[in-house]
Each structure stands twice: as structure tokens, then as C-alpha cells.
From Swiss-Prot:
It comes from Escherichia coli (strain K12). When exposed to oxidative stress, Gsp amidase activity is transiently inhibited in vivo by oxidation of the catalytic Cys-59 thiol to sulfenic acid; this modification does not affect Gsp synthetase activity. Gsp amidase activity is negatively autoregulated by the Gsp synthetase domain, and is activated by the Gsp synthetase substrates, GSH and ATP-Mg(2+); the occupancy of the synthetase active site may initiate communication through the protein as manifest by the release of inhibition of the amidase activity. The two activities reside in distinct domains (N-terminal amidase and C-terminal synthetase). The two domains expressed independently are folded and functional; liberation of the amidase domain from the synthetase domain highly activates the amidase activity. This is Bifunctional glutathionylspermidine synthetase/amidase. Residues 2-195 are annotated as: Gsp amidase. The gene is gss.
Length: 619
């Protein structure tokens, strides 16, 4: 970012000129911002249709927008511009194909090319953030680049570049020199399968991924009513759990900033990998059959994917993280939970007891959710559907708060008793309001069970009621009505079903974040040991952990015993201060939104497992 401002600087958001392809370059002079116009963080989000470009009008936003408009590809979201240099793929936006991206160091025998990304390390002019630009032209011994957040004054008419950098060619190697004397150019990135002279993807040192235990000094901070029961949301949590977060509120866990950065990178990358696999599944009947979804729903699934693939609000990935690395267990893409605990209750815990310089890595979760809702295409009134489980009360209220922050009207429906039909067969709530947009806590699989109770041959289509003698509305009568916009969309059952895990492994074999998974116990799984998991199981139910000696290490019961199983490479959770610890990250709008921890004295995390306080320790 440019230091200071000059009299020639244009106000924030002013069009400064154009890069090749007619891609606009905007002023990012934040000192000129009108606080009233930009009082909400969501206003800074830049979108083209449903595709998130970045934060207005930073360098990353421009680079992603340039690639999107000119080549139809984007790179995954990053926290800082310098982190782009560690990415190794681009996503093709029309079909979610993943394309290889290679990084070449400054001074490489591989020449830079027009259209390549140029990446700076953090430091100097680009302190903390680093920088990214687009190489637009090689002009003799100069390279012309286009960028945002360096200059803030209009370009000369017709000029489609912001700066010229000197290029030195010596002994067959290409070195670019910046116009600033205190910066470091890492290199350039080219979309190609050719890996000659490219850098391998950097790997984080194992010790930086270690989860550590810590303690607060016990001054009685949590002896009384430390949660505010006058706040309806906190009160709903207290009604379900009391003034309690875990067995010992003075104990907490810490991770490094490097570990959080790795979680951000992994979450964003895995989300795109899951989307890529979902696209493959929905194009292949043989793959889709592996998910045991009623065949009568297949056309609706494909329509949902075609029309609403960018409408997912939030999900949760479950990881194992320790010195061995980072491995994903599964993606709860359909009906994830733990948002309230991570984004509110543990934030109150930190305010009440933690005095260090670290932070709760889910502190901004509700703001992220509000931002996602603002760009969701949801209708102005959203019905929030939950079952009558007391824990669902605060989960529903947390999402309601995010919706209100985003400007939506809402009504929470506890169970289905309030719903009915008007004279025309339209679905209405107890106040006579039409139900046409819902966010649900129910899993889609619950609705599928209602369909399985009816033979496909009895009906020409999904058996949705538009009336009933006892006014009995079922879940499928709401979620599968064509005019009802449901969040999360129907297609999210595919990434949320564990049948996708063997498909992911086949598409990305030996990927550093994946575990070998199959529909049978193959030879490799016999060697490593394996976890047996029902494909649509939830809450850690019906899981067996089997060692390479065929010894059962842990076993849980539940209601999913009749389901098809997958077999996943055994990768046990680390035991830290007496508990097995699982890392969970939230996706919001397809990008990382925060982290929390679950802890249990057994190897399998279950519904009743604790949420553990987590602090990211700053250097």
C-alpha cells in the first residue's frame, strides 16, 4: 500500500483508468473514505454476480477481477497478498475445474509472460500485506504492470499500465527490479502444467501446527453469571447449557499464527476441491448412485447445482492438526453447527478471562455471516426453521442475528406445527405470511428419509403436500417446494456426504490435506488402520476406529448402522492435556470464516463433546 497521500490522489473508489481487457482500476485512498458511506464492513466486499473478487479496492481484488474477466479463472481467497505465491491452482469459474498454477522465483530461467501474476513479499512499502500485480506487457528491458493500491491518481488517457519495472537478463535468468528500494519481488505465477524451473509448494514446519494447553489464573472469573442472561441469545445458550462452556473454563488451548494461516489456506483450497468433486458426481450417474440419495431427487439436485452453486452460506470442516500435518476428516456442508459457541460464547469467555495479546479466531464470524447474507440473493423475509431441541434455539438465534445485521426480516419456526396451507395450497406460517425463503438447522437427509417412506412408483414427482385433513406439514412439504428458496441449497448434501471422500481421493491422490478413503478396506487401509463411517452419519455416531493390528480402538453407537460405510485412513486426534482435540473451521460464502476446537476424553468427537477455548498467539 502506498505511504501517505498527495494532492493528486483521487478519492476512494474513483476510476483511475483501465488495464488490458477493459478491467477498471480504482483508487484505494482509504484516507478519503466517508465513514457514513462505508460504516458496514460488508460494503467493502467486491462481487461480480455471485463471484467474490475481494476487498475494495485492494491489490488482491484487482488481480482476481482481472483473471476473472479476461480468463474466466480465479485464485482462492487469501489473507494477505504475499500468500498467493504459495497457491498452486486456479479455479475455472464456469465448471469448477481446477487448473495448475506454477510459481517461478525472481531470477528464474523461466521468463515472465503477459497475464502472469507478479507477487511481492511482505516488508517495506508492502509491510505485513505483500503485494500482487498483473504483468500486462514485456516492453524491451521493461515489464509493464497493472495494479491497485499503489497509485491513487488517474492514469494518462489510453495508458493501460500503472508502473514499469526494469528487467535484467543475465546468464539466461530473468530478474525484475521494483521502483521501491525497500521491497522484495518473490516472483511470477503462470497457469501451466509445465513445472520446469517452478518452485514446489511450501510446507509448514510441523512444530508450528502443534496445539498447546494453557491456563488462566483462577480469580473466580467464571464462578458467577459471567454470561449476560438479559441478552436473548446468551440466555438461550444458558437455558441449554448453563453458565458452562467445558469441564474447566480456566483451561484453554493455543495455536500459532502460522497454524491459523495454514488452516485458512487449507479451508479455502479444500472448499474448492469439494466443489470440483461435487461437479464430477452430478455429471455421472454411477458416482451419484454411491450417495444413496432417492433417485426421484436427482434432477432437482442437478438443477440446484446449476442454479445455486454460489448460494451456500456456511459449513464446517473437521480436521486433525498436529506435528504430523493437517488432515481433513469431513465437510459438514449441509447443516453445520458450533457457530454460537465459537463466535459469541468463546468471545465472551475471552473478554471475561483472557488478558494476553492473542485472539479468538472466530471473533469475526457473525460479521462474516452477515456479509455472506447480504450477497446471498435471499428474499427479504427469511423463515428460520429449527427442530425443538433446546440447543437449536441459540443456533437459530445466532443466525437470526446475522440476518438482521444484513438487513433481513425473520421469523423463527420451532418445529412444523405452526405451518399450514392457504386456500390455494400455498405454504403459510401462523401469521398467514407466505413461506418462500428458509434457513434450516435440519439436515437434508431428514427430508430424504420422508421420501424413502414412499415408493417412487406411487407418484409422478416428489410427494409434496399442498393440503392435509389434519393440516400436517412435513419437512419435505417445505424444503422441496419449488418456490421455497432453501439455505443451505439442496446440492450441499453431496459435499456433506462422506461418499464424496473416496471420490476426492481419486481426484487428488496423496494430497497433503486428504486421507486415503475407499468404499472397501483396501490393502493400504489394512496397513494404516482405518475408521469406519456411515456415509450420512452425524455427530460422531456409528464410527469404529480399527488399528493396523485389527484392534478396535474406539466405537460409537447411533441410528446410522444401516447406512453404507466408507473406510478412511486411521489418523487419530492428538491428545493434549488429557483431551483428544479436533480443529474445526467455518466456511462462510465459500471462504474461511473462523476456527474452533472440540475436545473429548475419547478418540471420537460426538455431539456432547466440549467446545474448548482457543487463542491464536501473536508473535
Amino acid at each position: 500500500m502506498s505511504k501517505g497521500t498527495t494532492s493528486q490522489d483521487a478519492p476512494f473508489g474513483t476510476l483511475l483508468g483501465y488495464a488490458p481487457g477493459g478491467v477498471a482500476i480504482y483508487s484505494s485512498d482509504y484516507s478519503s473514505l466517508d465513514p457514513q458511506e462505508y460504516e458496514d464492513d460488508a460494503v467493502f466486499r467486491s462481487y461480480i454476480d455471485d463471484e467474490y473478487m475481494g476487498h475494495k479496492w485492494q491489490c488482491v481484488e484487482f488481480a482476481r477481477r482481472f483473471l476473472f474477466l479476461n480468463y474466466g479463472v480465479v485464485f482462492t481467497d487469501v489473507g494477505m497478498a504475499w500468500e498467493i505465491f504459495s497457491l498452486r491452482f486456479l479455479r475455472e469459474v464456469v465448471n469448477d475445474n481446477i487448473l495448475p498454477l506454477q510459481a517461478f522465483p525472481n531470477g528464474s530461467p523461466r521468463a515472465p509472460v503477459a497475464g502472469a501474476l507478479l507477487i511481492w513479499d511482505k516488508g517495506g512499502e508492502f509491510k505485513d500485506t505483500g503485494h500482487v500485480a498483473i504483468i500486462t506487457q514485456l516492453h524491451g528491458n521493461k515489464v509493464r504492470i497493472a495494479e491497485q493500491n499503489v497509485i491513487h491518481s488517474p492514469l494518462p488517457q489510453g495508458q493501460q499500465w500503472t508502473r514499469e519495472l526494469e528487467m535484467v537478463v543475465e546468464n539466461g535468468c530473468y530478474t525484475l527490479k521494483d521502483t521501491f528500494d525497500d521491497t522484495t519481488i518473490l516472483g511470477w505465477m503462470i497457469q501451466t502444467e509445465d513445472t520446469e524451473y517452478s518452485l514446489p509448494q511450501p510446507e509448514i514446519a510441523g512444530e508450528l501446527l502443534k496445539i498447546s494447553g494453557a491456563r488462566l489464573e483462577n480469580k473466580g472469573q467464571f464462578d458467577g453469571k459471567w454470561l449476560d442472561e438479559k441478552d436473548p441469545l446468551q440466555n438461550a445458550y444458558v437455558q441449554a447449557n448453563g453458565q458452562v462452556i467445558n469441564q474447566d473454563p480456566y483451561h484453554y488451548y493455543t495455536i500459532t499464527e502460522s497454524a491459523e494461516q495454514e488452516l485458512i489456506k487449507a479451508t479455502n483450497e479444500l472448499h474448492l476441491m469439494y466443489l470440483h468433486a461435487t461437479d464430477k458426481v452430478l455429471k455421472d450417474d454411477n458416482l451419484l448412485a454411491l450417495f444413496d440419495i432417492p433417485k426421484i431427487l436427482w434432477p432437482r439436485l442437478r438443477l440446484s447445482w446449476q442454479r445455486r452453486r454460489h448460494h451456500m452460506i456456511t459449513g464446517r470442516m473437521d480436521f486433525c492438526m498436529d506435528e504430523r500435518g493437517l488432515k481433513v476428516y469431513e465437510y459438514n456442508a449441509d447443516s453445520a453447527s458450533c457457530h454460537t459457541e465459537a463466535g459469541l460464547i468463546l468471545e465472551r469467555w475471552a473478554e471475561q478471562g483472557y488478558k494476553g495479546n492473542g485472539f479468538n479466531p472466530a471473533e469475526g464470524l457473525i460479521n462474516e455471516l452477515a456479509g455472506a447474507w447480504k450477497h446471498s440473493r435471499a428474499r427479504p423475509f427469511v423463515h428460520i426453521m429449527q427442530d425443538k431441541d433446546i440447543e437449536e434455539n441459540y443456533h437459530a438465534q445466532f443466525m437470526e442475528q446475522a440476518l438482521h445485521q444484513a438487513g433481513f426480516e425473520t421469523r423463527i419456526l420451532r418445529g412444523l406445527d405452526e405451518l399450514g396451507w392457504d386456500a390455494a395450497g400455498q405454504l403459510i406460517d401462523g401469521e398467514g405470511r407466505l413461506v418462500n425463503c428458509v434457513w434450516k438447522t435440519w439436515a437434508w437427509e431428514t427430508a430424504f428419509d420422508q421420501i424413502r417412506e414412499v415408493s417412487d412408483r406411487e407418484f409422478a414427482a416428489v410427494p409434496i403436500r399442498t393440503g392435509h385433513p389434519q393440516n400436517e406439514v412435513r419437512l419435505i412439504d417445505v424444503l422441496l417446494r419449488p418456490e421455497v428458496l432453501v439455505f443451505e441449497p439442496l446440492w450441499t448434501v453431496i459435499p456433506g456426504n462422506k461418499a464424496i471422500l473416496p471420490i476426492l481421493w481419486s481426484l487428488f491422490p496423496h494430497h497433503r490435506y486428504l486421507l486415503d478413503t475407499d468404499f472397501t478396506v483396501n490393502d493400504e487401509l489394512v496397513k494404516t488402520g482405518y475408521a469406519v463411517k456411515p456415509i450420512a452419519g452425524r455427530c460422531g455416531s456409528n464410527i469404529d476406529l480399527v488399528s493396523h493390528h485389527e484392534e478396535v480402538l474406539d466405537k460409537t453407537s447411533g441410528k446410522f448402522a444401516e447406512q453404507k460405510n466408507i473406510y478412511q485412513q486411521l489418523w487419530c486426534l492428538p491428545k493434549v492435556d488429557g483431551k483428544y482435540i479436533q480443529v474445526c473451521t467455518f466456511t462462510v460464502g465459500g471462504n474461511y470464516g473462523g476456527t474452533c476446537l472440540r475436545g473429548d476424553e475419547s478418540l471420537v468427537i460426538k455431539k456432547e463433546s466440549d467446545i474448548e477455548p482457543l487463542i491464536v498467539v501473536k508473535k
